[in-house]
Design a protein with these regions (language model features):
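Beta-sheet-rich sandwich/jelly-roll-like modules and their strand-loop junctions
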Residues: 1-48, 95-96, 100-174
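Aromatic- and Gly/Pro-enriched, solvent-exposed loop/edge beta-strand patches characteristic
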Residues: 40-116
């Protein structure tokens, strides 16, 4: 989930010569967690820029996914879109949509106090995999792309002091 600022998290998939046999994206699989029903998110595909960051959109239209409430493995069919896997690699990105139907209000206690903090989050959450080195995960926030930083503070194991990359699987076809 994210707070009131739009965010896009992106993961790089490097090209492999075996993809020449199945060069088109057939579908994408994600692990989604949502506290609201029918939460919407956007999938985007980007080329790889000169500095290794996400660059230009590969597919211009929004690919809207809808998540039911709870934890789900979700597959989105891309076969009608004719998206070719570029030989320079491909960023797959997950965009949180800051819209009313994605709002989730949460309240939690302040340490050593009787007061509580109220926050509005925007669902759904996307699954992340912990990795020790960040070679391919980026975050678009406040108008620019930045490498994802290590999880800090009260992050649960196995994420603490590691990086999180999108838990995404791409299925290719010819």
């Amino acid at each position: 989930a994210t707070e009131k600022n739009p965010e896009i998290k992106a993961r790089l998939f490097d090209f492999d010569s075996t993809y020449l046999e199945t060069p088109f994206l057939k579908s994408i699989k994600l692990r989604i967690y949502s506290d609201v029903k029918n939460a919407k998110f956007n999938i985007r595909f980007y080329s790889v820029g000169e500095n290794g960051q996400p660059d230009k959109p590969i597919y211009e239209k929004n690919i809207i996914g809808i998540s039911k409430k709870g934890t789900k493995n979700l597959e989105i069919d891309l076969s009608d879109l004719n998206i070719n896997f570029p030989d320079t690699g491909l960023f797959v990105s997950y965009e949180w949509l800051i819209i009313e139907e994605n709002e989730f209000k949460i309240s939690f206690p302040i340490k050593d106090s009787k007061k509580r903090i109220e926050k509005t989050l925007y669902e759904p959450k996307v699954g992340l995999l912990p990795i020790t080195q960040n070679t391919n995960s980026w975050l678009y926030k406040n108008g620019k792309w930045e490498k994802v930083e290590r999880f800090k503070g009260n992050s649960p194991k196995p994420y603490l002091d590691n990086y999180g990359i999108l838990a995404i699987e791409l299925i290719l076809t010819n």
